[in-house]
Swiss-Prot record:
Purpose of the protein: Binds preferentially double-stranded telomeric repeats, but may also bind to the single telomeric strand.
Keywords: Chromosome, Coiled coil, DNA-binding, Nucleus, Telomere, Transcription, Transcription regulation
Main location: nucleus
GO molecular function: double-stranded telomeric DNA binding; protein homodimerization activity; single-stranded telomeric DNA binding
Annotated protein name in UniProt: Single myb histone 6
Keyword flag Lipoprotein: no
GO BP terms, alphabetized: nucleosome assembly
Entry coiled-coil feature ranges: 244-288
Gene: SMH6
PANTHER family assigned to the protein according to its UniProt record, in alphabetical order: SINGLE MYB HISTONE 4 (PTHR46267), TELOMERE REPEAT-BINDING FACTOR 1 (PTHR46267:SF8)
Ranges where the HTH myb-type domain occurs: 1-61
Gene3D superfamilies attached to this UniProt entry: 1.10.246.220, Winged helix-like DNA-binding domain superfamily/Winged helix DNA-binding domain
Length: 317
């Protein structure tokens, strides 16, 4: 058994550090032979120096890590607590020194803030819809499907986007920002009285903008000037005159519907006649085909008799 190991003294550790600083790590024999350190390290071998140096490095690294952890823990404890809102502490580990990044609180929004955010989202959806209709720039307006396809190509809509789009288009049409004609939407013309306009005003504007057909006996299409004159005359009508004009328009509409029904009946009758004629033609074709087949059979029988009978008679004679 060798001699028991003795604890390292502070003088020996100081001599070891000075020797490494002078000669470098791994030069254990050189350090032991150095006259300045040989007297202090006379009871140590090169293996002892190597082990001690390794242990000293481990102790130093462990203590530094503990110091960093303690400082980080103190930093976390010094963060003020918020009783009204919840805090989320995000720790990011660094490969260099394992520092802790400053925490950012994730604050739960109150009901007023949520309402504000929802109103902002609704306003943003309004702007997106108006932008889509403006960029599509279709003369007669854009269909809901066309608007949805444009928004889906430009943005990332939510899962319930179709429902939101339908509701928002309805709201915009009711408020007068959009005009709906034949399931198509277009932006209403801006005017100073747009805010005071009733929900039914877009229909009147549509009558002014679109080519209007006034049905009469000759069914003619009025021009823009004629439409303006007619609208001006309607604006100056009394209640009695307006009721008479409405009754006349209803009567004209009923007459047009009656004419349409009569035309539909005539079309059905013509279609029935065409089907009957086609059936007659098919029957005649089948009859002619069967008749030609019968004639062909008779001709074959006659030809066979003309050939067989002379042969039979000559054989018996």
């Amino acid at each position: 058994m060798g001699a028991p190991k003795q604890r390292w003294t502070s003088e020996e550790e100081a001599a070891l550090r000075a020797g490494i600083a002078r000669h470098g790590v791994g030069k254990w024999r050189t350090i032991l032979k150095d006259p300045e350190f040989s007297s202090t390290l006379c009871y140590r071998s090169n293996v002892d120096l190597k082990d001690k140096w390794r242990n000293m490095n481990v102790i130093v690294s462990t203590s530094s890590s503990r110091d960093k952890a303690k400082s980080a823990l103190k930093r976390i404890r010094t963060i003020p607590k918020n009783n009204e809102h919840t805090m989320a502490i995000t720790r990011v580990t660094s490969d260099i020194d394992d520092e802790i990044v400053d925490e950012k609180p994730i604050v739960s929004l109150p009901s007023e803030a949520k309402n504000t955010s929802s109103s902002k989202k609704s306003h943003r959806l309004d702007n997106i819809i108006m932008e889509a209709i403006k960029n599509l720039n279709e003369p007669t307006g854009s269909h809901r499907t066309t608007i949805a396809n444009y928004i889906e190509e430009q943005y990332w809509p939510p899962s319930d986007f179709d429902h939101l789009l339908s509701a928002k288009l309805k709201d915009l049409s009711t408020s007068g920002k959009l005009i709906k004609v034949n399931r198509k939407y277009r932006i209403a013309p801006s005017s100073p009285n747009s805010e005071r306009r009733s929900p039914k005003m877009p229909l009147l504007e549509d009558v002014q903008r679109e080519p209007v057909k006034i049905w009469s006996d000759d069914t003619k299409t009025l021009t823009r000037s004629q439409v303006d004159a007619e609208l001006a005359r309607m604006a100056t009508m009394t209640a009695e005159e307006a009721s008479v004009a409405a009754a006349r328009a209803v009567a004209e509409a009923e007459a047009i519907m009656a004419e349409a029904e009569a035309a539909a009946k005539e079309a059905e009758a013509a279609e029935a006649e065409a089907q009957a004629a086609q059936a007659f033609a098919e029957a005649a074709f089948l009859t002619l085909k069967n008749r030609n087949a019968g004639k062909l059979v008779i001709a074959l029988i006659h030809a066979s008799l003309c050939y067989i009978l002379p042969c039979f008679i000559s054989y018996h004679i």
